[in-house]
Amino acid sequence: MPGFTAPTRRQVLSLYKEFIKNANQFNNYNFREYFLSKTRTTFRKNMNQQDPKVLMNLFKEAKNDLGVLKRQSVISQMYTFDRLVVEPLQGRKH
């Protein structure tokens, strides 16, 4: 499929930062830590990928996943949860 271009490093880093930002929006500690861990693991796993087709597919899939993560983080903010023992009492440290 001629005419497609792989995402730039800047685009990928921007997408990564959006994932981290949205994962940090979760009120629930377990969900927040899960999505932070999953984001880091997924991006590191594909960090050395060179094939432009694969990169483009990964980028498109990640953008779709980001949309889901954004919606879920908004929903998460509508509900409150009791703090867990592992969470600091005075706000969150990132």
From Swiss-Prot:
Transmembrane segments: none annotated. GO terms for cellular component: iron-sulfur cluster assembly complex; L-cysteine desulfurase complex; mitochondrial matrix; mitochondrion. Keywords: Mitochondrion. One of its GO terms (biological process) is iron-sulfur cluster assembly. Pfam families: Complex1_LYR (PF05347). The keyword Cell inner membrane does not apply. InterPro entries: Complex1_LYR_dom, Complex1_LYR_LYRM4, ISC_assembly_LYR. It comes from the Eukaryota. It is found in: Mitochondrion. Coiled coil: none annotated. Interacts with NFS1. Present with 2440 molecules/cell in log phase SD medium. Belongs to the complex I LYR family. Required for mitochondrial iron-sulfur proteins biosynthesis. This is Protein ISD11. It comes from Saccharomyces cerevisiae (strain ATCC 204508 / S288c). The gene is ISD11.
